[in-house]
């Protein structure tokens, strides 16, 4: 199994942990866009998506829609509502990628290295900033809680 396949399997495991069904079909054409439906807690993941390097991010994005609870509607008349749902899907997708990196001891010295490694498009770079800032905040908070519980001193 290569690194991309490992990440995809890990994402499928995350979906399963959150009672999200991931359906695939080997016959889907490479341009069939992956989708998700919150009510069914289901993701339709296209294993033939081209370019192949985008497959993990598209799966993480669709899982992100369900985890965020935002319903995406292609018939939505209010573009800002749809953009918010897409942004939430993007943010959670990046947070999932960061969690994968953390659990697999993968580190990057810069955000740009993360962006390049996962082929994150320019349209999602603001969410990379949001996700990394949130992750750093959560790590600092956890460290403070551990320090307080072990020493009784606030850092």
Residue spans for each PLM region:
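Active-site hotspot residues in diverse enzymes, especially metal/ion-binding acidic/histidine motifs
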Residues: 1-155
